[in-house]
Amino acid sequence: MDTSDFNFVFLGQSVLKYQVPLDVYNTINHIYETKYPELKPANKQLVGKIEKEHSLFFNGEDSNKMTKHNYLPDNVLGWFEQKFKHYLEWNKIREYNLHFNSVWINTMFENEYNPVHVHQGTLFTGLSSVMILKLPESY
């Protein structure tokens, strides 16, 4: 596997930084911008103090907060899965059950934030990722 597209920092638990392919980046932005009116608000299931949180993918248990749905094409989901598997291999985690649960977009404005929180899952560490899609010109 080619590993030239990432870097790492040890902070107790490893943090890996990947370069997102332009087609994945453009696809996610395009879906968000064109499907925005259809996207389910994700606020009920997220801890962020953010007004605009919308789900692009959910594969968890259906509840009153969220039901299964998918707006992402296979190449985008496959890219995430490939990176999560690489993360596990990098950390020498050999036995795991990978369950890709959710993808959402936070559109954040001044004074909005994500508090410190824990993501739960069956893997002892859980996996989480963040992708910055757009920054204001004044940033």
Task: Give the positions of each predicted feature.
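Catalytic core of non-heme Fe(II) oxygenases with the double-stranded beta-helix
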Residues: 104-139
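Hydrophobic residues on conserved beta-strands that form the core of alpha/beta folds
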Residues: 100-102
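Non-heme Fe(II)/2-oxoglutarate
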Residues: 1-95, 111-114
